[in-house]
Each structure stands twice: as C-alpha cells, then as structure tokens.
C-alpha cells in the first residue's frame, strides 16, 4: 500500500505498489517525495515469491537463503493520513535482472526481468542512513551462491462453511 492522494487506487484511498524500480523511483509521483527525503527502509523476509513460467503457465516459486536465515530487502517508505489515521507504506526496490544467472528465470518470458535488492547484514545501517545520491552503491545483485528457489504452490483456501 503506498500513500498517494486519497482519490487514487483501492477503494479510492490508496494504491498498491509492492515494487519501485530504481531506474525511475526518483521520477514517479508515487515515490519521488520519499526518494527526495532519502526515506530508505529494510524489509526482513524469510522467503519471497516470484512467478516462474513452465510450459507457458505461471507457477509460484519461493526464493530463500540456502542456510534458511532471514534476509533484508532494500525498500523505500512514506506515510500519509487516510480517514484520520496515519498509514505507513513501503515498496521494495528492484533492479534489472535480464542477464542475472538466477533471477532471470522468473516472470513472463517476454517481460523484463526484475530482482529485489538484498542488503547484506554488514551494510544495513549504512543503507538506512545513506542519502539518495549514495543509494546506487547499495544496488547489489542477488548473490547467486547464497540463494535457491523451489516450487511453492499457494495453499488451497477452504470454502466457507
């Protein structure tokens, strides 16, 4: 959920923007204010999910560290007031992954390949405190040797009783 004017998006209140492209984050109306203020964040995760196309059909694949430890994803954040309540939002920053040996297997074959940015533990504080002019120093490619992926079908939802 990203904080934009109340007339945009879901229920005329907000807009879902899970990802922000590093190439355009400073220009997009949804993100440029937060970028200008260097409002950087980290999202801790154990696994992310991406579509992988097998025989023309999307399958849900989980991407996680080989050692099973959580990792942190570079993000940008902002806040706004909706119906009198403060709403905070974050979007993961992504980089091009067309030529990445691991991340290029995800998304539709004809689409541009994108990757999250994993911020290693030793750079977390630096990322959170950097200025927008320094941010590209942290646009690391996914470390291939540390990650793996497997098919993770969505759990079946139980029908209402």
Which residues does each PLM region occupy?
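Short acidic/glycine-rich loop or secondary-structure boundary segments that cap or lie
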Residues: 50-54, 82-84, 101-102, 158
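A motif-centric signal for short, conserved binding hotspots located
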Residues: 5, 64-96
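Tight coil/turn sites that cap or link beta-strands
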Residues: 46-47
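Residues that flank catalytic or metal-binding motifs in active/ligand-binding sites
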Residues: 39, 59, 69, 88, ...
């Amino acid at each position: 959920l990203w904080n934009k004017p109340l007339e945009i998006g879901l229920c005329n209140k907000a807009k879902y923007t899970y990802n922000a492209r590093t190439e355009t984050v400073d220009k997009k109306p949804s993100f440029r204010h937060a970028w200008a203020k260097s409002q950087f964040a980290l999202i801790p995760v154990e696994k992310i999910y991406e579509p992988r196309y097998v025989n023309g059909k999307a399958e849900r694949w989980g991407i996680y560290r080989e050692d099973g430890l959580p990792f942190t994803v570079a993000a940008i954040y902002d806040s706004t007031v909706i119906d009198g309540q403060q709403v905070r939002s974050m979007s993961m920053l992504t980089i091009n992954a067309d030529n990445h040996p691991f991340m290029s297997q995800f998304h539709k074959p004809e689409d541009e390949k994108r990757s999250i940015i994993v911020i290693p533990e030793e750079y977390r504080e630096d990322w959170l405190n950097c200025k927008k002019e320094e941010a590209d120093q942290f646009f690391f490619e996914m470390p291939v040797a540390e990650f793996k992926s497997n098919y993770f079908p969505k759990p079946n939802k139980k029908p209402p009783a």
